[in-house]
From Swiss-Prot:
Subunit structure: Dimer of dimers.
SUPFAM superfamilies associated with the record: ALDH-like
Family that this chain belongs to: Belongs to the aldehyde dehydrogenase family.
The protein's name in its UniProt record: Betaine aldehyde dehydrogenase
Pathway: Amine and polyamine biosynthesis; betaine biosynthesis via choline pathway; betaine from betaine aldehyde: step 1/1
Enzyme class: oxidoreductase
């Protein structure tokens, strides 16, 4: 099945091709077939995207917020009306099963556009009384923003970054991952159809050099990245050269803590969602599952039973529950972590093998008897590999859960809500769940601490990261100067 777009890039309101750029083959992970071939952005394409964005942004910012909101709301409606065809494209691009993409990818993007459309007219300043004088504040857009996406949720990420940027009066040049480049082009088309003026959301394709060129350009006021910690470090350093605003959502090695009074089926379901959904390729996954000793074996037995029942296969089959990893390179990486876990003494409970050939499939895999020092407990795998660790006391598990450089997410399962709140208050994570896991509604802020990132996406908190405050002092009387 082919999914060739009209052109590799979308700049100034139209598809744009420049075949001089290095080729980017788009491979369907389920069978290894090339479904499209794009080209990397040349310097001319990058310049056109930045120039048109900078030019269009000023008029866009001058519109009433409600006028901007109408366009984003129309785009949200268009996405929902076309969700099935967009979800099929997302499945072809990523390998995620259709039963996931129909509910979790473009629908979340539509939610973001709708949410920020509703929020935009309510973003106002404040008045500070100072006797007869006063100060008022204005929230102003930052200007030209750069968004850099990841390959695991390409279309959702594009929407999560574009929605607040555009709603608040900014322009954005977006570079999707070269592994999954197709969804962002569809978003650009839909925004234009909804009435967005040309130049405000441009899409350019490419690898790291293209991202570096965007981030280092003097016209760029803000960078929003979703990616790995090494990429984040490089982008952060480049943005710092120009003292640019930065939001980063990076990796994680998140703890999911299950106390012995938890509802076992719910806790197991959450652990599976937090390790096997999207074939485990989710940054916030709870890949360190801490289970209190008294229920560990019962937890593992039922977990293995449910994991073995997961239906793998063609992701376009609506009955399939788990698809392939995104690429052969990711498959090789995940299999290497499985071998390390075996070598370091992990007890394989289920899975552990490549599965369903051709394609980049790995069975849902669970290791028990994992200790804090093992590679599987320290490094982000980004695949369907769960590490189960046991614990005895609340104090112990809090200390061990926090003993990581990451701090993206955490979860707690217990029937004792007092304990749940007490534990969550001590966990070093930007996003926490109690008796739930990996639910990320756009109404709530999302982001990490420590090496997992800076800033927040979604919720009202995103306003802080796409606007700047101007203070205006108003003197109501004569100026009293001492000279």
């Amino acid at each position: 099945m082919r999914a060739q777009p009209a052109a590799s890039h979308f700049v100034d309101g139209r598809p744009l091709e420049d075949a001089a750029g290095a080729p980017i083959p788009v491979i369907h992970p389920a069978n290894g077939e090339e479904i499209a071939r794009l080209h990397e952005a040349t310097p001319a394409v990058i310049e056109a995207a930045l120039a048109s964005g900078a030019r269009a942004q000023k008029d866009w910012a001058a519109l009433r917020p409600v006028e901007r909101a109408r366009i984003l709301r129309r785009a949200s409606d268009l996405i929902r009306a076309r969700n099935e065809e967009l979800s099929i494209l997302e499945t072809l691009d990523t390998g995620k099963p259709l039963q996931e993409t129909l509910v979790a990818d473009w629908p979340s993007g539509a939610d973001a556009l709708e949410f920020f459309a509703g929020l935009a007219p309510a973003v106002t300043g404040e008045t500070v009384p100072l006797g007869q004088d006063f100060v008022y504040t204005i929230r102003e857009p930052l200007g030209l923003c750069v968004g850099i996406g990841a390959w695991n949720y390409p279309s959702q990420i594009a929407c999560w970054k574009a929605a607040p940027a555009l709603a608040l009066g900014n322009a954005m040049v977006f570079k999707p991952s070269e592994v999954t480049p197709l969804g962002a082009l569809k978003l650009a088309e839909i925004l234009i159809e909804a009435g967005l003026p040309p130049g405000l959301f441009n899409v350019v394709q490419g690898r790291g050099a293209v991202g570096a060129a965007l981030v280092s350009d003097s016209r760029v006021a803000k960078v929003s990245l979703t990616g790995s910690v090494p990429t984040g470090r490089r982008v952060y350093a480049a943005a710092a050269e120009g003292v640019r605003h930065v939001t980063m959502e990076l990796g994680g090695k998140s703890p999911l803590i299950v106390f012995d009074d938890a509802d076992l089926e719910s806790a197991i379901g959450a652990a599976m969602l937090g390790n096997f959904y999207s074939s485990g390729q989710i940054c916030s996954n709870g890949t360190r599952v801490f289970v209190q000793k008294g229920i560990k074996e019962a937890f593992l037995a039922r977990l293995a039973e449910r994991a073995d029942a997961i239906q793998m296969g063609d992701p376009l089959d609506p009955e399939v529950q788990m698809g392939p990893l995104v690429s052969p390179a990711q498959l090789e990486k995940v299999l290497s972590y499985i071998e390390k876990a075996r070598a370091e003494g992990g007890r394989l409970v289920c899975g552990g093998e490549a599965s369903v050939s051709p394609g980049c499939y790995v069975q849902p895999t669970v290791f028990a008897d994992v200790t804090d020092g093992m590679t599987l407990a320290r490094e982000e795998v980004f695949g369907p590999v769960m590490a189960v660790l046991d614990f005895e006391t609340e104090e112990e598990v809090i200390a061990r859960a926090n003993a990581t450089d990451f701090g993206l997410a955490a979860g707690v399962f217990t029937a004792d809500l007092t304990r749940a709140h007490r534990v969550v208050a001590q966990l070093q994570a930007g996003t926490c769940w109690i008796n739930a896991y990996n639910l990320t509604p756009v109404e709530a802020p999302f982001g990490g601490v420590k090496m997992s990132g800076v800033g927040r996406e979604n919720g009202r908190a995103a306003v802080e990261h796409y606007t700047q405050v101007k203070s205006v002092y108003v003197g109501m009387g004569p100026v009293d100067a001492p000279y």
